[in-house]
Amino acid sequence: MKSFLISVLGDDKPGLVDGLSEIIVSNNGDWIESNMSSFEGKFAGILKVNVPSSDAAKLTKDLNSASLGLQIACEETLPVDKHSNVRSYNIELIGQNHVGIINKLSHVLADELQANVEELKTEIID
């Protein structure tokens, strides 16, 4: 069994997820996890797929030749060693928006705390 991370980006339209899932299932793949969104008329997503080793090459070929109108990148992943002594934090920051706010926050997290950002969601609320 092989695992792949697949990223997609393109103009949003009906049928994109259906098209991706059809390619995956036709190659005996299992859609494990995903995060997909539509922003400003664009569709972006990342998903994890498991596929039998014997079908891996055909899956990547089919994804690369798909006529879905998406930019698709497919990369094989290896098992990740999760350290049990790593601490997780959930940070919620509410404040006035200004240029560089994410840069300042990420600098503190990376350089001062050696923290890894695993998920980031931002929005401006009027």
Regions found by a protein language model. Give the residues of each.
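A conserved regulatory-domain signal marking ACT and ACT-like small-molecule sensing domains
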Residues: 1-126
